[in-house]
């Protein structure tokens, strides 16, 4: 009987130690391209941003890139959190080249179409205001409900850096 109790206790102890094993979270398929970004929007007219820097006078604001619900490596979401044009659109992406685009993508925030071209993420591609290297993002956008095209600009250029956590970079 003593051996049976000892065996039961040993089995219970072994099971309790096994249940303490923590399983880390898995990475999403677009983890290298996903993030929080501080961007500025410039107008582009004839390939130049001259005189069209920070076109709307907003300075830098936050956008997000993240995986879709399907969590496949060839698509991700670009979302401005309502900070600028109120858009959330699914784009096609190439995680190896870190590029992305969409033509007439459905805006999930309200009924409109969004075209994003020449989207790219460059690892350590820029310096933040604090002097730290950070990933750089750049893409061009045309909204189908933008009344200022083509009178004032051809498209909008979003560019900026990945969130670093440093106060001086916010």
Q: Which residues does each PLM region occupy?
A:
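Sec-dependent signal peptide recognition
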Residues: 2-10
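C-terminal motif of bacterial Sec signal peptides marking the signal peptidase cleavage site
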Residues: 15-19
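Bacterial signal peptide processing site
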Residues: 21-23
């Amino acid at each position: 009987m003593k051996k049976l109790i000892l065996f039961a206790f040993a089995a219970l102890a072994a099971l309790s130690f096994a249940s303490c094993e923590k399983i880390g979270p898995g990475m999403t398929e677009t983890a290298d391209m996903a993030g929080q970004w501080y961007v500025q929007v410039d107008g582009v007219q004839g390939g130049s941003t001259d005189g069209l820097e920070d076109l709307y006078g907003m300075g830098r604001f936050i956008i997000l890139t993240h995986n879709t619900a399907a969590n496949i490596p060839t698509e991700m979401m670009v979302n401005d959190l309502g900070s600028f044009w109120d858009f959330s659109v699914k784009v096609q992406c190439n995680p190896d080249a870190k590029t992305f685009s969409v033509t007439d993508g459905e805006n999930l925030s309200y009924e409109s179409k969004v075209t994003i071209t020449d989207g790219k993420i460059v690892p350590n591609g820029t310096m933040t205001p604090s002097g730290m290297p950070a990933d750089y993002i750049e893409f061009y956008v045309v909204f189908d409900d933008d009344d200022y095209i083509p009178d004032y600009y051809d498209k909008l250029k979003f560019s900026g850096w990945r969130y670093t956590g440093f106060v001086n970079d916010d």
